[in-house]
Amino acid sequence: MSQTTDIQTDVQEHGANQQTSNRRLYMQLQVFGHCTDIGRLIASLQQHQVQAVLYQDVNDPRGVGLLTMHEEPTFFVTTLRNLVNSDPFRELSQKLEFTMIGRSYSSGYESDLEDWLLHRPRRTVLNPAWPWAIWYPLRRTGAFAKLSPQEQGSVLREHGTIGRAYGDADFAHDIRLACHGLDSHDNDFLIGLIGKELFPLSHVVQTMRKTRQTSEFIQSLGPFFVGHACWQTPSR
């Protein structure tokens, strides 16, 4: 006799005060080489009217990074696909090892759930006062999932406290996206560190290395993309 188990499935995002939402923002970074005319790329982005940031790659003098964002994931296989398969983007060489994608998510404590999921990530990456960015994926070890909820909360609060301190000082502003099942290397999260100067972004990574989460429960970090925005979609 077979026994069935009732599994509660809830794919909504949850915030404070019983807020719920089925909306979320997808963000993708694609990195290219052999760019000799950034102006043509900017003109193409303006023509296609996509929400995007174009970065100059710090570690490749002919490299660029294209960060795009949309609520509807079909955007990436329609509008964006057509864009990168047309001139001038199709003339570039793509660095697939740096392709990163993730979706906004909630922790259950957000006071303004819609702002957290949809608007804050856009505001952060499109702010002209914060042109510097470090993007990287990470994967936790299985041991983290086996911790009790109380232990997990303690580990995550340590990271959160550091992140808020850097943000309050206007040193670094973070974007945290989930990429379970979306990342080609089976990473769990995609992190963006955004700010007005590069050094504080590097410094927060250094500081995080000392935390329990990074020192004990991270299986892999990177690759790291370091870029400086040369064009951002104007904020609305």
What are these regions (language model features)?
Residues 1-49, 61, 70-79, 91-165, ...:
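Short S/T/G/P-rich N-terminal loop/turn motif that feeds into the first structured element of a domain
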Residues 56-58, 81-84, 162-166, 204-206, ...:
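Short, surface-exposed, polar/charged, turn-prone segments marking secondary-structure boundaries
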